[in-house]
């Protein structure tokens, strides 16, 4: 196994509550990994630690040639991680005072340091790819939830990141917009983008993932191909969870 992304011994605490309790995970280049499990079990926190939105207490994260130890992380190393990740938030997290185009160019100019004209050209290309070529000048308030989340995904796509992180990308959407967002994620996955997806959409996880990880209590309980996890889970906790979600 050749790890493009390697997570070792990751621990995150909020006060006395240990949310991540020694996570070890490896992602191969182009691998699509879905994380499932009960609410409050640390799935979203894991993604946020990988982008240093939440600061882990222990453990190491390696992406390509950048390795960050939580105990001695430097600003340069953290920036190196962020430059290698694209994050799609469940609540869109768009800038209300920026257009669709402006939301996409923001990361290119601030994280990548691109000049404005180059960032604009990239944003227009991305808007075309996500089916919003005619909405570049629209503000979030004038767009549907599905359109806003597509802009959020486009913002992450624009960075050409080593790893795309999806934190329950459909949970805030009205049912009518879920399909279009899932279709866009499928298209990205078809390009063999390395992806880590937290989702409550079990059928989507079954379809898109090369590997499914079941988490509970801040730990990885079981992982394997979708056919195994959904068809023949080995751990009683995985079996119980899948029975509950139907």
Tell where the protein language model's regions lie, with residue ranges.
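C-terminal boundary and immediately downstream tail of ABC-type ATPase nucleotide-binding domains
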Residues: 216-217, 223, 227-246
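Exposed loop/turn and edge beta-strand positions of beta-sandwich/beta-sheet ligand-binding modules
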Residues: 1
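ABC family nucleotide-binding domain
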Residues: 4-5, 11-226
């Amino acid at each position: 196994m050749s790890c493009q992304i390697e997570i070792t011994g990751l621990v995150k605490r909020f006060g006395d509550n240990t949310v991540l309790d020694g996570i070890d995970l490896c992602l191969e280049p182009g691998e699509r990994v879905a994380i499932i499990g009960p609410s409050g079990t640390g799935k979203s926190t894991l993604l946020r630690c990988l982008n240093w939105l939440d600061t882990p207490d222990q453990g190491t994260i390696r992406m390509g040639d950048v390795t960050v130890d939580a105990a001695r992380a430097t600003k340069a190393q953290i920036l190196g991680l962020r430059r290698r990740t694209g994050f799609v938030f469940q609540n869109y997290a768009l800038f209300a005072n920026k257009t669709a185009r402006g939301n996409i160019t923001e990361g290119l100019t601030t994280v990548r340091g691109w000049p404005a004209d180059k960032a604009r050209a990239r944003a227009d290309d991305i808007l075309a790819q996500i089916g919003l070529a005619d909405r570049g000048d629209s503000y979030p308030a004038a767009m549907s939830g599905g359109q806003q989340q597509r802009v959020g995904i486009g913002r992450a796509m624009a960075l050409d990141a080593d790893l795309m992180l999806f934190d329950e990308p459909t949970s805030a959407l009205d049912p009518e917009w879920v399909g279009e967002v899932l279709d866009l994620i499928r298209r990205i996955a078809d390009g063999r983008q390395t992806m880590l997806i937290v989702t409550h959409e079990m059928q989507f996880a079954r379809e898109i993932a090369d590997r499914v990880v079941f988490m509970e209590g801040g730990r990885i309980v079981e992982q394997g191909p979708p056919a195994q996890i959904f068809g023949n889970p080995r751990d009683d906790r995985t079996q119980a969870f899948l029975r509950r979600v139907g």
